[in-house]
């Protein structure tokens, strides 16, 4: 089966990581560094928690390992909000992996935040897409 055929059949929900690791825009870079190291991940999703008591976490941005390295190298005292990519590439869980792969390629990003009704619910990486294709091919 061709890879493009596999990508058309599978959805983002089939391959994404659920249970995202998040931070607040006000978190210091030490906290973001610790979260990435603890979970062995390449990005942390920055969320706007909304008013106290509200269950309304909204995507604010993404701090990737690349932005983190730049921030750690800065002489300034920065927080996650200072280095997060605000024009975050996002995708819906029901989108095809083909759509997600094209979005990653056109945006030149290695991760997409999976958003359902405005709320971040997962992360899809290029490696997740590769693993999904490999798993389907292994079943042949």
Regions found by a protein language model. Give the residues of each.
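Tandem CBS (Cystathionine beta-synthase) repeat/Bateman regulatory domains
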Residues: 1-140
